[in-house]
């Protein structure tokens, strides 16, 4: 069964959006295979966003993602990677359609509520970064 990694970012947790976001995924029929509230360390943030290391926004991204707790989860279901990407909406909230998570809740490109794996390969890498095998049900 296909799995993806999803993270509700500090702005989403701070604004009390966790329940609504989880409900959207559950209504879509996805199974939660793992879930935890956590504080991301500087090292984990840098590993997670390693592909952006040389970009000018990298320090701010790491600072933001470590600024408060996040909810990390693994969702499972047919076509879950692509479907979650569609449900999240465009990265920039001004481009995100109403009815998508970012379209409904994101305020800026920097604080856009949620992260989801872009590909199956990314999902496998991100799941392994955030969860030990025994944490996956």
Swiss-Prot record:
Reactions the enzyme catalyzes: a 2'-deoxyribonucleoside 5'-diphosphate + ATP = a 2'-deoxyribonucleoside 5'-triphosphate + ADP; a ribonucleoside 5'-diphosphate + ATP = a ribonucleoside 5'-triphosphate + ADP
EC identifiers of the protein: 2.7.4.6
Entry's transmembrane regions: none
GO molecular function: ATP binding; metal ion binding; nucleoside diphosphate kinase activity
Presence of keyword Kinase: yes
Residue numbers binding ATP: 9, 57, 85, 91, 102, 112
Localisation: Cytoplasm
Cofactor(s) listed in the protein's UniProt record: Mg(2+)
GO biological process: CTP biosynthetic process; GTP biosynthetic process; UTP biosynthetic process
Active site: 115 (pros-phosphohistidine intermediate)
InterPro entries assigned: NDK-like_dom, NDK-like_dom_sf, Nucleoside_diP_kinase
Primary location: cytoplasm
Alphabetical keyword list: ATP-binding, Cytoplasm, Kinase, Magnesium, Metal-binding, Nucleotide metabolism, Nucleotide-binding, Phosphoprotein, Transferase
Source organism, top-level taxon: Bacteria
CC annotations in GO: cytoplasm
Enzyme class per UniProt: transferase
Pfam families found in the cross-reference section: NDK (PF00334)
Xref: HAMAP family: NDP_kinase
Subunit structure: Homotetramer.
Function field: Major role in the synthesis of nucleoside triphosphates other than ATP. The ATP gamma phosphate is transferred to the NDP beta phosphate via a ping-pong mechanism, using a phosphorylated active-site intermediate.
Similarity remark: Belongs to the NDK family.
Cited PANTHER family: NUCLEOSIDE DIPHOSPHATE KINASE
The name this protein goes by in its record: Nucleoside diphosphate kinase
Gene from which this protein is expressed: ndk
């Amino acid at each position: 069964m296909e799995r993806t990694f999803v993270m509700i970012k500090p702005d989403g947790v701070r604004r009390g959006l966790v329940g609504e976001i989880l409900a959207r995924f559950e209504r879509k029929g996805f199974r939660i295979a793992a879930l935890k509230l956590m504080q991301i360390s500087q090292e984990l943030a840098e590993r997670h966003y390693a592909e952006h290391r040389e970009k000018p926004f990298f320090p701010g991204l790491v600072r933001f993602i470590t600024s408060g707790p996040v909810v990390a989860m693994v969702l499972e279901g047919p076509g879950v990677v692509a479907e979650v990407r569609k449900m999240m909406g465009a990265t920039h909230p001004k481009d995100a359609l109403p009815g998508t998570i970012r379209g409904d809740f994101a305020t800026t490109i920097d604080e856009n509520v949620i992260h989801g794996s872009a590909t199956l390969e990314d999902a496998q890498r991100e799941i392994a970064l955030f969860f030990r095998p025994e944490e996956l049900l």
